[in-house]
């Protein structure tokens, strides 16, 4: 167990050891000057003032208080507006954040994939993970803030103000990254994507939260719901109340419900992400088709079918193929299929690494008739468990200094990320006979056995989702 006062340097060493990096492999290092505090901002922050007012606070209302239903169309419009007047520096900043969250995302995905069985499937959001950690960074004071910054991948070096992350810039860039994924490209663009994030802050009764922290979350989670309830008397009952409340507020069936937290917890941070992609030009095939979970077991699932010119690559050396399908003006769905079902684990370990985007350069356009399952993937994971596996169990533990979240001595319980990932056709049900495209003979690509997927935003290079599809309608 790492001591609470772990130095910044030791934290970085822990992170690098967990990531399995040798010094010569640090090709990902990048000048993150766009993400740290500017000199003028530092001068203002460091100017002594005896009249600095205390941060205003809010007291979360009881969990019985009703919340307006989540309006996902309004959230979509808000994300799109955030990208309408981007300057070059905003896009560069988003690219820097994309680099950081991809780096962290691949390592966390590896940890999750080793923990979850192949049969259970997996869907993971690097953006939600990075946003959650950045949120805690904005609420932290040293030494916790320095340790979180190192974990986010930006060593503070001299630890001066101008080497410290500006959490507001990072959260704003995360909003940009989300907006770029769903932004339309005009009348001829792809079908609309929905990407909605809701954060629930659940506190012990009477605990006060600082308003700047709560308001700052709106960049990546436009809807933040602070609620209070008894977390200690019956943790199982508290978990049931939270699950009912979030389902009532969002209408989303997130699958695996929140389990009971430790009875001494005073704050639970739960981020819920709903993604719905519609594949333009694809239709739902009549009836159900067998999806082979393994060589002897199949399940009937609805399938989507479409034809067009997609980017494709068959890697015979590593026994895999990759198909790239546009989802929006800036977003792509990447489908990675092992040539043999038993090779799924090997392909997963090979593909989901830091050279993932480099491999995409091998793709070339080709006429394809693509058949892919309709997807409803669900997953939940506790960031506290991931930190323990990273040998940083105290990072958000009892001794964490989270003085920008509350003046109370917080005890952070579960830090949950839950994902609901849906992939559908944008058209009606296809006729029994699907016409083939004119021109070159189309390659038949059918994903009717376990495969991998990724959702990429090309402008920032950020990976929004990574997944392993074992059961298209029940991966959780």
From Swiss-Prot:
Signal sequence region: 1-24
Keywords, comma-separated and alphabetical: Disulfide bond, Glycoprotein, Secreted, Signal, Vasoactive, Vasoconstrictor
Glycosylation sites: 295
InterPro entries, sorted: Angiotensinogen (IPR000227), Serpin_CS (IPR023795), Serpin_dom (IPR023796), Serpin_fam (IPR000215), Serpin_sf (IPR036186), Serpin_sf_1 (IPR042178), Serpin_sf_2 (IPR042185)
Disordered: annotated segments: 45-64
Compartments reported by the entry: Secreted
GO annotations of cellular component type: extracellular space
Cysteine disulfide partners in this protein: 42-161
Major location (coarse): secreted
UniProt modification remark: In response to low blood pressure, the enzyme renin/REN cleaves angiotensinogen to produce angiotensin-1. Angiotensin-1 is a substrate of ACE (angiotensin converting enzyme) that removes a dipeptide to yield the physiologically active peptide angiotensin-2. Angiotensin-1 and angiotensin-2 can be further processed to generate angiotensin-3, angiotensin-4. Angiotensin 1-9 is cleaved from angiotensin-1 by ACE2 and can be further processed by ACE to produce angiotensin 1-7, angiotensin 1-5 and angiotensin 1-4. The disulfide bond is labile. Angiotensinogen is present in the circulation in a near 40:60 ratio with the oxidized disulfide-bonded form, which preferentially interacts with receptor-bound renin.
GO biological process, alphabetically ordered: positive regulation of epithelial to mesenchymal transition; regulation of apoptotic process; regulation of systemic arterial blood pressure by renin-angiotensin; vasoconstriction
GO MF terms, alphabetically ordered: serine-type endopeptidase inhibitor activity
Domain of life: Eukaryota
Pfam short name (any one): Serpin
Described function: Essential component of the renin-angiotensin system (RAS), a potent regulator of blood pressure, body fluid and electrolyte homeostasis.
Family indicated by similarity: Belongs to the serpin family.
Protein name: Angiotensinogen
Annotated organism of origin: Ovis aries (Sheep)
């Amino acid at each position: 167990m790492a001591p609470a006062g772990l130095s910044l340097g030791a934290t970085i060493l822990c992170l690098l050891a967990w990531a399995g990096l040798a010094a010569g492999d640090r090709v990902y290092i990048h000048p993150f000057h766009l993400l740290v505090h500017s000199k003028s901002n530092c001068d203002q922050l460091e100017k002594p003032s005896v009249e600095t007012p205390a941060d205003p606070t809010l007291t979360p209302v009881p969990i019985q208080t009703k919340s307006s239903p989540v309006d996902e169309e309004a959230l979509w419009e808000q994300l799109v507006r955030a990208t309408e007047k981007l300057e070059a520096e905003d896009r560069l900043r988003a690219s820097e954040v994309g680099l950081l969250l991809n780096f962290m995302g691949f390592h966390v995905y590896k940890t999750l994939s080793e923990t979850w069985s192949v049969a259970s499937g997996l869907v993971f959001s690097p953006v939600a993970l990075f946003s959650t950690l950045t949120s805690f960074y904005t609420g932290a004071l040293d030494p916790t803030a320095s340790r979180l910054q190192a974990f986010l991948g930006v060593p503070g070096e001299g630890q001066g103000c101008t080497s410290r992350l500006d959490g507001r810039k990072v959260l704003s860039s995360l909003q940009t990254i989300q907006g770029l994924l769903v932004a339309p490209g005009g009348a001829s663009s792809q079908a609309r994507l929905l990407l909605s994030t809701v954060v629930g802050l659940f506190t012990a009764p009477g605990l006060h939260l600082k308003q700047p922290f709560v308001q700052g979350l709106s960049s990546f989670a436009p809807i933040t719901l602070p609620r209070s309830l008894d977390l200690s008397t019956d943790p199982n009952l508290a978990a049931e109340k939270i699950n009912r409340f979030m389902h009532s507020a969002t209408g989303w069936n997130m699958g695996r419900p929140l389990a009971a937290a430790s009875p001494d917890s005073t704050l639970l941070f739960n981020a819920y992400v709903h993604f719905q992609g519609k594949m333009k030009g694809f239709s739902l095939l009549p009836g159900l088709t067998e999806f082979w979970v393994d060589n002897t077991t199949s399940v009937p699932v609805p399938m989507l079918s479409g034809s067009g010119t997609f980017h494709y690559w068959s890697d015979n050396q590593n026994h895999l193929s990759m198909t790239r399908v546009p989802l929006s003006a800036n977003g792509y769905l990447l489908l990675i299929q092992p040539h043999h079902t038993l090779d799924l684990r090997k392909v997963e370990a090979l593909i989901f690494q830091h050279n993932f985007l480099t491999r995409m350069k091998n793709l070339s356009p080709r006429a394809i008739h693509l058949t892919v399952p309709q997807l409803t993937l669900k997953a939940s994971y506790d960031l506290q468990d991931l930190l323990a596996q990273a040998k940083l169990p105290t990072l958000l533990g009892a001794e964490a200094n989270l003085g920008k979240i509350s003046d109370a001595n917080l005890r952070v319980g579960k830090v949950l990320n839950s994902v609901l990932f849906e992939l559908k056709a944008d058209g009606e049900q296809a006729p029994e006979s699907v016409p083939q495209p004119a021109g070159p003979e189309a390659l038949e690509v059918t994903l009717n056995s376990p495969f991998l997927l990724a959702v990429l935003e090309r402008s920032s290079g950020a990976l929004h989702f990574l997944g392993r599809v074992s059961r298209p309608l029940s991966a959780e």
